[in-house]
């Protein structure tokens, strides 16, 4: 028999002065998709009518300017002293501020803080709708259960994490005929530019917690740290059957497996009981892990909360037929999220005292673990790029991690370098200069700090054993058999010192160095006196030097760059450094240059003379090359990964501050191409087929005329395809045409295994040791040849024979961080290419095996891409 229609008004009696969402909206839950403004109107009206139970906090704005709010709901008694309760909870979160006895006393009387996060993915619409019914029920219901729950908890409701994505989705869907449950309906196929899952910049907001790159993430993180809840639920959709924890493996070691298993079982059983009352189906311990700290559930768990992902089984459309023919609706998906949220809140309130006590213990364990763990702290050398060091510090601070800086030099007796050369990591005596960053792991956020900073976060032996067993089984299967998927849900490496390309050590010394708190961005600058010199030198010892050059070019000023080292007026001109000559620029140069240099923290060195005593290369040399203003096109629309496009968009607009033109693939033809001198292909698929021979030929001709063709990840590896032939590089393990006599010959399991071992097994995402050619323009600005390079997937590149392999993987000891397949990955990856430049006529084909802009995560690779954009259109073969 079909189930009865779910009743959202089952928790009677309700306070009559609180308006129902349906009364404010003009329709019932699930009848249509609500817009942001409709939700905003509804929530604020409920809050205004229930001021004794609800307070509203403005926590930020989205990229497109939509307000982000947090609604705090509790009993009238608690709400009257909410500020004091929050202060007490923050004190509870820092075991250094009170004794165990004081913490135990607080835990006996304090409410539990429970955060319910809605609509992080904008097209997972059941979560967005359920927020209104959750707030209404908590604000209006007068049942003993709800009143008792509010007396023992403070509920924090974030009604929409990603309003910009949700608005795109809603406006598109509401403009169509909706509600058809059959088949592959139009509403399921959002146009490329809509895809409401992502925010304005098409970032996946549930992968942004490490980078903290988007304003929505930053606002939510700051609010979380201002409240420090004990429970955090992140609502998602849509899966076949509703999911709530316990999680599958792997679980991040710093999450404390037993602690998280105990509490996710408590909440899982509470959710199960609520669902069982209605006969609803659900799953646990499948697919959704708790390993990658970029997820909301992992990040909040590592911060001390019980962080959980809930996945509902409908939303995104009004109705669908399941595989067995039964019907499920948006209203059902809303109801499932609504009931799970209430069950979790009620369970937290009932278990309030133990929950608070265990929360304190988890936070305290970060301090006590550091006493016995050899890894006491992480020290990061200042290097030559203070802005990059400051950006890393800010990233940590946005995660609530305490960061300090050394005021004077100090020495560690037991320091472990992050990068070593063969064998086990060395333990050495190491001196550190003033200005080094220090992150003590003995701090309340120490567990999160450790997983973000440690060289690699281990996976359990049991999990690894299961993956290797699957691989062995897959190798032996015949071509008709289905292979097993591996259980990696996301990347396995993210260590921030590697990601930022900063030299780092972890130390064992029990006595910490003397430091001072870091409260301001690290951005010193050096400006010359008011005199107007004949030229300015901008040393390329920091990333922002290249950004300064780009912005000057963007504004129409003339900038040169040294292709070989030289001297002028007694000052060394390093390879790649920038020279801005006054007499070749308008008078406004001096003011604009000083403003930009101050903003970006870039020293300006005045050059009073072009004369050189010691070298043949000076300001008048042919090796000082004028740079062309990059006129950038980024391929967009179908075939292009939205997140790949979005990360490039964000990088160009927000990181570099330069303009670009999105261009459709089919528009890449002669007249349109001639407008640009840089074309970037983000990650995507099917490019050569979509372009066809005329399109590829037009692209090749454009490159030969001086264009820089940049391909990122799969947006570049298609250059190797037979139909493209834009590079001489080929793929490792590429299939060869079998001999005619072998075509129909059956293979033994051993032969199949041997053949498959010649191909890379797909990587979930790890970091590998690589070598950089610093004499090539792509290597300008780097202070060392050794580089850490990320890689995922099963595409490895053989070196090109017709250009420069600007970055190549090391010969041995390749794996630096994360997971690789023993006996396969390093054997096939050794000495292959990571970044290739193939001069073609007057232009360049630049192929990056991985995307430096991925999730705004690999900050240390930025210069590789900046150099391609900045120097690619200005370098002809032989300049290097």
Predicted regions and their residues:
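Aromatic- and acidic-residue-enriched carbohydrate-binding clefts of CAZyme catalytic domains
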Residues: 185-203, 739, 744
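Intrinsic-disorder/low-complexity accessory segments
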Residues: 1-125, 129, 133-154, 201, ...
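Short, conserved secondary-structure transition motifs
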Residues: 150-169
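Short, solvent-exposed turn/loop segments enriched in Gly/Ser/Thr/Pro and often Arg
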Residues: 159-163, 173, 235-241, 715-716
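Aromatic- and acidic-residue-enriched segments that line the glycan-binding/catalytic groove
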Residues: 167-183
């Amino acid at each position: 028999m079909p189930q009865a229609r779910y009743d959202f008004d089952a928790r009677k009696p309700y306070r009559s002065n609180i308006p129902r969402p349906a009364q404010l909206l003009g329709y019932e839950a699930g009848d249509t998709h609500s817009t942001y403004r409709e939700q905003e109107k509804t929530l604020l009206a409920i809050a205004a009518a229930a001021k004794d139970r609800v307070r509203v906090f403005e926590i930020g704005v989205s990229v497109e300017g939509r307000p982000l709010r947090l609604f705090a709901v509790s009993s009238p008694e608690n709400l009257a002293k909410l500020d004091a309760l929050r202060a007490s909870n923050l004190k509870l979160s820092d075991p250094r501020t009170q004794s165990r006895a004081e913490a135990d006393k607080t835990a006996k009387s304090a409410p539990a803080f429970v955060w319910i996060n809605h609509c992080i993915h904008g097209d997972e619409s059941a979560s967005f709708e359920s927020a209104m019914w959750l707030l209404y029920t908590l604000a209006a219901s007068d049942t003993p259960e709800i009143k008792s729950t509010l007396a023992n908890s403070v509920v924090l409701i974030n009604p929409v994490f990603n309003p910009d994505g949700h608005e795109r989705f809603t406006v598109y869907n509401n403009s169509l005929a909706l509600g058809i449950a059959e088949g592959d309906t139009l509403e399921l196929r959002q146009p490329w530019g809509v895809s409401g899952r992502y925010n304005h910049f098409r970032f996946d907001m549930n992968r942004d917690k490490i980078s903290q790159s988007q304003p929505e993430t930053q606002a939510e993180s700051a609010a979380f740290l201002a409240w420090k809840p004990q429970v955090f639920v992140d609502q998602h959709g849509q899966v076949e059957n509703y999911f709530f924890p316990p999680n599958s493996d792997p679980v991040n070691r710093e999450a404390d497996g037993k602690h998280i298993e105990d509490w996710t079982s408590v909440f899982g059983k509470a959710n199960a009981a609520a669902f069982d009352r209605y006969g609803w189906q659900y799953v646990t311990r499948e697919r959704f892990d708790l390993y990658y700290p970029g997820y909301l559930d992992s990040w909040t768990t590592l911060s001390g909360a019980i962080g959980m992902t809930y996945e509902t089984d409908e939303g995104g459309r009004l109705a669908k037929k399941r595989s067995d023919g039964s019907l499920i609706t948006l209203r059902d998906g809303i109801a499932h999220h609504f009931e799970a949220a209430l069950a979790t809140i009620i369970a937290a309130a009932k278990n309030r005292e133990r929950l608070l006590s265990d929360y304190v213990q988890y936070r305290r364990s970060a301090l006590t673990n550091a006493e016995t763990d050899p890894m006491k702290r992480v020290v990061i050398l200042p290097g030559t790029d203070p802005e990059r060091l400051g950006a890393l510090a800010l990233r940590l601070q946005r995660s609530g991690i305490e960061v300090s800086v050394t005021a004077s030099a100090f020495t560690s007796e037991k320091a472990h370098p992050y990068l070593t050369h063969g064998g086990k990591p060395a333990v050495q005596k190491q001196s550190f200069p003033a200005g080094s960053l220090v992150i003590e792991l003995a701090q309340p956020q120490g567990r999160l700090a450790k997983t973000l900073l440690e060289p690699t976060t281990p996976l359990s032996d049991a999990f690894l054993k299961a993956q290797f067993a699957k691989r062995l089984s897959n190798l032996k299967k015949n071509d008709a058999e289905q292979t097993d998927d591996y259980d990696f849900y996301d990347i396995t490496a993210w260590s921030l010192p590697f990601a930022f390309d900063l030299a780092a050590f972890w130390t064992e010394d029990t006595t910490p160095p003397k430091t001072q708190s870091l409260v301001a961005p690290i951005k010193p600058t050096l400006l010359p006196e008011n005199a107007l010199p004949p030229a300015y030198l901008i040393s390329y010892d920091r990333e922002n030097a290249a950004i300064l050059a780009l912005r000057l070019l963007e504004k129409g000023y003339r900038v040169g760059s040294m292709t070989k080292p030289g001297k002028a007026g007694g000052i060394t001109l390093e390879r790649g450094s920038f020279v801005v000559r006054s007499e070749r620029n308008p008078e406004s140069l001096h003011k604009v240059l000083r403003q930009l240099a101050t903003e970006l923290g870039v020293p300006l060195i005045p050059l009073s003379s072009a004369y050189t005593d010691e070298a043949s290369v000076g300001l008048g040399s042919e090796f000082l090359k004028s740079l062309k203003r990059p006129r950038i096109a980024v391929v967009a629309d179908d075939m292009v990964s939205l997140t790949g496009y979005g990360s490039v968009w964000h990088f160009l607009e927000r990181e570099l501050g330069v303009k670009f033109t999105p261009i459709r693939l089919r528009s890449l033809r002669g007249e349109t191409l001639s407008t640009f001198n840089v074309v970037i292909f983000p990650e995507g698929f099917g490019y050569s087929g979509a372009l066809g021979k005329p399109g590829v030929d037009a692209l090749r001709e454009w490159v030969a005329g001086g264009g820089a063709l940049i391909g990122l990840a799969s947006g570049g590896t298609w250059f190797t395809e037979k139909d493209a032939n834009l590079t001489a590089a080929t793929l490792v393990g590429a299939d060869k045409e079998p001999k005619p006599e072998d075509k129909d010959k059956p293979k033994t399991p051993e032969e199949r295994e041997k053949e498959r071992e010649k191909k890379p097994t797909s990587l979930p995402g790890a970091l590998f040791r690589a070598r950089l050619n610093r004499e090539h323009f792509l290597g300008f600005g780097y202070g060392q040849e050794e580089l850490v390079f990320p890689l995922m997937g099963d595409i490895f590149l053989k070196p090109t024979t017709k250009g420069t392999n600007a970055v190549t993987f090391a010969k041995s000891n390749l794996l630096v961080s994360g997971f690789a397949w023993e006996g396969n990955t390093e054997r096939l990856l050794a000495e292959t290419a990571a970044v290739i430049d193939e001069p073609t006529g007057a232009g360049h084909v630049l192929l990056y095996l991985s995307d430096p802009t991925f999730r705004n995560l690999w900050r240390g690779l930025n210069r590789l891409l900046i150099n391609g954009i900045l120097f690619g259109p200005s370098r002809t073969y032989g300049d290097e």
